[in-house]
Amino acid sequence: MKTVVVLDYGSQYTQLIVRRVREKGYYAELLPWDAKEEEVKRLNPTAIILSGGPSSVYEKDAPFVPEYVLHLNIPILGICYGLQALVHKFGGRVEKSQKREFGHAILEVEEDPLFEGLPKKFDVWMSHSDRVEKLPEGFYVIGRSENSPFAAIRNKNETIYGVQFHPEVTHTQFGSKILENFVSKIAKMEKNWEMKDFVSEKIKEIKGIVGNDKVILGLSGGVDSSVVAMLLHKAIGDNLVPVFVDTGLLRLNEGEEVKENFERLGIKIFVVDAKKRFLDALKDVEDPEEKRKIIGHTFIDVFYETSMQLLEEFGNIKYLAQGTLYPDIIESKVSERKSAAKIKTHHNVGGLPEKLPFKIIEPLRYLFKDEVRKIGEILELPQSMINRHPFPGPGLAVRIIGKVTEEAISILQKADYIFIEELKKNNLYDKVWQAFAVFLPIKSVGVMGDYRTYENVIALRAVNSFDGMTADWSKLPHEFLNKVAKRIINEVKGVNRVVYDITSKPPATIEWE
């Protein structure tokens, strides 16, 4: 398959470039900027995009444009740092700008295939402190802004382009169109990426790999593992062995709902009741990182033991399926960089492959979350499963601040249920990206009737986001929040105060722990 190869120079927006190109119907993949020539050639590249990044071309050990990229004889587009790296490579001059350009700017463009179908002036998003001061020989200006006289450039052959702004972010008007013009008009690539084609090809591929053997899958009920389950079920039917571990840290009635949902879809799941084991392991633990590690290790132990029992029962389980997504693959590579700062330990089953005697199948490893949801629709999963809000791997343990107790779990489950139920009743659930309740480690004084109370506090959190990388707090109606708070205080024993979290990400993370 022909591929647009995006080389990653460290920008926080790099994944968005791949997503925007795919959204337009062209297959794209992301590789580190210093990927070997063979890695790039293996993807059958039809165009190269150099991402932005935080470096300066004059820094020691600054990332550069690999020589082989220029010898592939395919179109190249440099974005922000990618533009500066190209200019530097060809002998132009890049310098520190006296005025850092960050945020909106008006771009004025010349007539060019890159801007075909666009107005003469439009808004773009800038984020740079260096800027191009002199073009290399054979390059021309095709776009400028007030502070960037060389905001868009190309060479005379119309094969090498550079833009100082970020077409991949939604703040840039017509950004997706610019990327599409580069791929379709300059690289002359034909559309080759549709989800329904992916589904039929993936089912065929799984059949070919697995044959008559069985595949075990750790099922959470979330969209990723549910889509993996449906793909596998379409491919191998009852040779799928889905295992659902009930940690006791799930939402109210969630275990029963997952079982019923999959039974309706004709998929039998194996439920493991491990509630006591997880609660015992978490006894008196308050540190969020420690909670995550304990839950991760306990999950691995439970899943390992269950897998061995099922292997003994069925005999021919040869594969372990995982719901790994493309961002997971990218982040695992990024985490190897010295500059990558760990914010939280991610809960996953990464320790499983080494312990289990199975080969790994990751049907979604090159997909983004929005693409997974599209596959869910093609496979006719219920909308309630496809549009389910994200839920952390460690479950309610990281929504209970402090010690995890049976009482705290019970209170939080009921409060969270009321919040979600009211969001759905008021047609607000699908308008927020994620919503949940948090159990706080404090008590507050209250009055109920003629009596003083001293009870627990619940925080409500709802955010709007595109991909979870950044998020704004949701401006839910005051009347709605008032109703939810009243219901929680009246219906959940042990709560006398409800607060609403109005912090965006950054500076906060979406989850409290």
From Swiss-Prot:
Enzyme class: ligase
Tree of life domain: Bacteria
Glutamine amidotransferase type-1 domain residues: 3-192
Reactions performed catalytically: XMP + L-glutamine + ATP + H2O = GMP + L-glutamate + AMP + diphosphate + 2 H(+)
UniProt binding sites for ATP: 220-226
CDD domains listed in its UniProt record: GATase1_GMP_Synthase, GMP_synthase_C
SUPFAM superfamilies reported in the protein's UniProt record: Adenine nucleotide alpha hydrolases-like, Class I glutamine amidotransferase-like, GMP synthetase C-terminal dimerisation domain
One GO term describing the cellular component: cytosol
Keyword Nucleotide-binding among record annotations: yes
Molecular function, one GO term: ATP binding
This enzyme's EC code(s): 6.3.5.2
PROSITE patterns: GATASE_TYPE_1, GMPS_ATP_PPASE
Catalytic-site annotation from UniProt: 80 (nucleophile), 166, 168
Residue span, GMPS ATP-PPase domain: 193-388
Metabolic or biological pathway: Purine metabolism; GMP biosynthesis; GMP from XMP (L-Gln route): step 1/1
Pfam families (UniProt xref): GATase, GMP_synt_C, NAD_synthase
Keywords: ATP-binding, Glutamine amidotransferase, GMP biosynthesis, Ligase, Nucleotide-binding, Purine biosynthesis
Complex formation: Homodimer.
Chain's role: Catalyzes the synthesis of GMP from XMP.
Protein name per the record: GMP synthase [glutamine-hydrolyzing]
